[in-house]
Design a protein with these regions (language model features):
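Conserved small-domain helix->loop->beta segment predominantly found in fold-type I
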Residues: 239-299, 303-309, 322-327
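PLP-dependent enzyme catalytic core of the Aspartate aminotransferase-like
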Residues: 88-89, 98, 118, 285, ...
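Conserved N-terminal alpha-helix of the aminotransferase class I/II PLP-enzyme fold
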Residues: 7-58, 83-90
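Glycine-rich beta-alpha junction loops
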Residues: 3-8, 177, 258-262, 283-287, ...
Length: 361
């Protein structure tokens, strides 16, 4: 842990100070512990280089800030992390256009591309509805039109998806989720080519100053040591829970690639090596009081934001005063998100069923 590095000579300092991304000068730019984390993540994501940030949102904002300029157009697909969508709106102040579109299949994306589109940004599976997109088809189209592709792949972790193998330019992860894995660290990463990541370092990282602390980098490295075991548990646990819930008539619809059909199932099989344990469902009711009763009846599952740590979490999208916003996002007000943590999945399943029994009695 240090903020500043010492040099043996004037010449050594001069050499390092003009190339801070490859030398240790000041921890705001680079640090040995953070570089170790970056090297591991680049290898896991099959990219040339990685830059780590203090949060996932730090990685997202630095990437968009670095690669877009006045007059450019940003195209965002389906439901994405809300703060990323808000940041895109903020970029309008700098003359950067953006649109967020909802599509049923990948081919619909391309009719929304403009002459000035510079980035196609998406999640796959998407936030909230967990829809899959055809990564290879998006990448092929984008390369023909000189458009960059950026995916937030946090849901599947670096172990269960490899977007760069299918031509995606940049992969973002929130390290606060599966990589950290213990609900005690914030962080974000972007992985891609040397050229693009160096550009993000020079502008987004250095100017926006979302620097990850060496200690947080160490915590993320600690998390990576158990990531394979935790993802194996996630893959097995989510199947236990979803197999038991899929025929429950109190649930209108389940959102998760494991429960998908037809083309969505084919895309999941092509692009996912396993399943993350974050899912959602709509309660089969118009009585919004049942949403509150369900959430308040959970005993093992905690109520809270974020996910990817050790504990199971639940979150309802309906907050009592946001029906118009949910309609705009095309979400049912009875939509509930659940993360299955490291507990015994049967314990989590019993908790969900108890809450359903209480809400629908």
């Amino acid at each position: 842990m240090t903020t500043s590095f010492k040099f043996d000579s004037y010449e050594d300092f001069c050499k390092a100070s003009v190339d801070e991304k490859n030398h240790y000068v000041y921890t705001r730019g680079s640090n040995p512990t953070t570089v170790k984390l970056e090297n591991i993540l680049a290898q896991l994501d099959h990219g040339e280089k990685c830059k780590v940030f203090a949060s996932g949102m730090g990685a997202i904002s630095a990437t968009l800030f670095s690669l877009l300029k006045q007059g450019d157009h940003l195209l965002m697909i389906n439901t994405i992390y809300g703060e990323a969508a808000s940041f895109a709106q903020y970029l309008h102040n700098f003359g950067i256009e953006s649109d967020r579109i909802d599509v049923a299949n990948t081919d619909e994306i391309f009719q929304h591309v403009k002459e000035n589109t510079k980035i196609i940004y998406f999640e796959s599976p998407s936030s909230e509805k967990f829809e899959m997109l055809d990564l290879q088809k998006i990448a092929n189209f984008a390369k023909k039109h000189n458009i960059l592709t950026v995916i937030d792949a946090t849901w599947a972790s670096p172990l269960f998806t490899k977007p760069i193998d299918f031509g995606i330019d940049l992969v973002i992860h929130s390290l606060s989720k599966y990589v950290g894995g213990h609900s005690d660290v914030l962080g974000g990463s972007v992985v891609g080519s040397n050229k693009l990541v160096n550009q993000i370092f020079e502008y987004g990282h250095q100017f926006l100053d979302s620097t990850n602390s060496p200690f947080n980098s160490w915590l993320a490295i600690r998390g990576l040591r158990t990531l394979p075991l935790r993802m194996q548990h996630a893959n097995q646990a989510i199947k236990v829970v979803l197999d038991a819930l899929k025929d429950d008539d109190r649930i209108k619809r389940i959102y998760h690639p494991y429960c998908s059909e037809n083309e969505q199932k084919e895309l999941a099989q092509k692009y996912l090596k396993g399943y993350g344990s974050l899912f959602a469902f709509d309660l089969n009711t118009d009585d919004l009081e049942k949403v509150k009763i369900f959430i308040n009846s959970l005993k093992t599952i905690s109520i809270g934001v974020s996910w990817g740590g050790y504990e199971s979490l639940a979150l309802a999208v309906y907050k009592g005063n946001n029906l118009s916003a949910l309609k705009k996002r095309k979400l049912e007000p009875t939509h509930i998100r659940i993360f299955v943590g490291l507990e015994d999945p049967n314990v989590i399943l019993d908790d969900i069923k108890h809450a359903l029994d209480t809400a629908f009695k």
